[in-house]
């Protein structure tokens, strides 16, 4: 059952491959946003 599910997952999520490729970058963007926000608050 698990092997069948794992075999079907790539085909089912084929349209979402670009989204999965971008997902690891999102936390880095939030971290960069936090640094920029802190800099703007401290410089005010």
From Swiss-Prot:
The chain crosses the membrane at residues 19-39. It is found in: Plastid, Chloroplast thylakoid membrane. The keyword Coiled coil does not apply. One of its GO terms (cellular component) is photosystem II reaction center. Its main location: plastid. It is a single-pass membrane protein. PSII is composed of 1 copy each of membrane proteins PsbA, PsbB, PsbC, PsbD, PsbE, PsbF, PsbH, PsbI, PsbJ, PsbK, PsbL, PsbM, PsbT, PsbX, PsbY, PsbZ, Psb30/Ycf12, at least 3 peripheral proteins of the oxygen-evolving complex and a large number of cofactors. It forms dimeric complexes. PANTHER family: PHOTOSYSTEM II REACTION CENTER PROTEIN K (PTHR35325:SF1), PTHR35325. Belongs to the PsbK family. One of the components of the core complex of photosystem II (PSII). PSII is a light-driven water:plastoquinone oxidoreductase that uses light energy to abstract electrons from H(2)O, generating O(2) and a proton gradient subsequently used for ATP formation. It consists of a core antenna complex that captures photons, and an electron transfer chain that converts photonic excitation into a charge separation. This is Photosystem II reaction center protein K. It comes from Tupiella akineta.
């Amino acid at each position: 059952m698990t092997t069948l599910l794992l075999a079907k997952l790539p085909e089912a999520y084929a349209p979402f491959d670009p989204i999965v490729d971008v997902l690891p970058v999102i936390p880095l963007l939030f971290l960069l946003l936090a640094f920029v926000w802190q800099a703007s608050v401290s410089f005010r």
